[in-house]
């Protein structure tokens, strides 16, 4: 599971993550995993590695930023999706911002 934001990993840890992914083992990403190992072009500390194209190469995405935080996220269009079972989609309010990820593979 990848749940980090803009981190350079120690080389040994990076190689373990990279090998896990490259051999086709499963990987799950949580929100900021889009830019998990990107330092926006900055040099990583000595002995650390980055993966600037992680988003495109692993997730098939293209993270370009995020929308501003709104007071609510409407989910009515997905009301019949199994993941929303038991959720009142008419009153649900999510807080936070949504990522801009286009195109999605």
Spans of model-derived segments:
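Cell-envelope and extracellular/periplasmic
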Residues: 1-5
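A glycine-rich, often tryptophan-bearing local segment used as a flexible ligand/cofactor-contacting loop or short
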Residues: 6-89
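Active-site oxyanion/phosphate-handling segment shared across diverse enzymes
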Residues: 86-105
